[in-house]
Amino acid sequence: MTEAIIDLKDIAVTFDDGHQVVHAVQDVNLQIQTGDIYGIIGYSGAGKSTLVRVINLLQSPTTGQVVVNGQALQTLSPAALRQARKHVGMIFQHFNLMQSRTVMGNVIYPLLGQKISKQNRRAKALRLLKLVGLTDYAQTYPDKLSGGQKQRVAIARALVTDPQILISDEATSALDPKTTTAILELLQRVNRELGITIVLITHEMQVIKSICHHVAVMADGRIIERGPVAEVFTAPKAPLTVDFVETSTNVRAAIQRITKTIKLSELAAGQELIAFKFVGQSTKQGIVSQLSQTLGVDVNILFANIDQIDGQNVGDMIAIITGDLTAFNAAVTNMSAQGVHTRIINEEVVKGMVD
């Protein structure tokens, strides 16, 4: 295992204005490995943005220890902390560009005051503008740029100090889907070509699914679930995680549509409405034909979807399975052995687990 570049230990952040105490972050332990793209997801108010501001001590924790690049940040002198912060770049939803400066002026701004010649500053900025695809816009002012172009400038500016970590705080939230995809692909390229560790904050599971290797789910200031993205998508445990996953894969909408169309009380004896989750090699196997031909189970497919998540195929299917109880139990056992997860939807509806 590679070394943890970020190690947050027993972090809590409490705000007290004299009238109300807010526990923004509670009992968080988080390790992020060098070179990872780590997503932190949660709804507004979950504490995710507060947590990532702890990484470079823009927000001091009430309790806990912050270790970045092997340095315990709370023990550093102000000068040493300023130097450590140069290794952590940040991009935000609203870009924070200076309107009075050109694209070039915005990118080189963090280098002003450093012992770098004007020629070298410009050369470095041009290399980064080439990386983000804005070489021809060096002398353009921000008000002439699209939202996606502004975010590319912000990324170049964040990289100009040669950070080892890049924090993306809802950086795609204000962008349209096509531009979001382009920015996420750029972040992947930054991670791949420059080896920069990326911490990505979002409320959209689609963003996590697109580029992250690991994910932590936050609610009420706590991490309620974490793990490799493909694993979390395949077998989410916390109800909030299930909600995020099923929304991003359209499974929730499909279940709602199907259960409104089909009267579950009219399912015949020996029929079940089943949701299947496939991962990895199981997506390439003819499991449906196996069920039909080997076990004598009829499969009526009502919904199917397949995604690629962190290099693995992850598929969903909803179907009505028809067969006697023995055949059905044999089918479930057979699929579990091949890495296929199953859920009986009609039982969940009866128990009120599905809206």
From Swiss-Prot:
Keywords, ordered alphabetically: Amino-acid transport, ATP-binding, Cell membrane, Membrane, Nucleotide-binding, Translocase, Transport
Annotated compartments: Cell membrane
Signal sequence segment: none
SMART domains: AAA, NIL
Residue ranges crossing the lipid bilayer per the database entry: none
Enzyme class: translocase
GO molecular function, one term: ATP hydrolysis activity
Bilayer disposition of the protein: Peripheral membrane protein
Enzyme Commission (EC) number: 7.4.2.11
InterPro entries given in the database record: AAA+_ATPase, ABC_transporter-like_ATP-bd, ABC_transporter-like_CS, ACT-like_dom_sf, MetN_ABC, MetN_ABC_transporter-like, NIL_domain, P-loop_NTPase
Residues of the ABC transporter domain: 6-245
Residues at which ATP binds: G42, Y43, S44, G45, A46, G47, K48, S49
Catalytic activity: L-methionine(out) + ATP + H2O = L-methionine(in) + ADP + phosphate + H(+); D-methionine(out) + ATP + H2O = D-methionine(in) + ADP + phosphate + H(+)
GO cellular-component term (any): plasma membrane
PROSITE patterns attached to this UniProt entry: ABC_TRANSPORTER_1, ABC_TRANSPORTER_2, METN
Record's subunit section: The complex is composed of two ATP-binding proteins (MetN), two transmembrane proteins (MetI) and a solute-binding protein (MetQ).
Family named by the database record: Belongs to the ABC transporter superfamily. Methionine importer (TC 3.A.1.24) family.
Function field: Part of the ABC transporter complex MetNIQ involved in methionine import. Responsible for energy coupling to the transport system.
Protein name as catalogued: Methionine import ATP-binding protein MetN 1
The organism of origin for this protein: Lactiplantibacillus plantarum (strain ATCC BAA-793 / NCIMB 8826 / WCFS1)
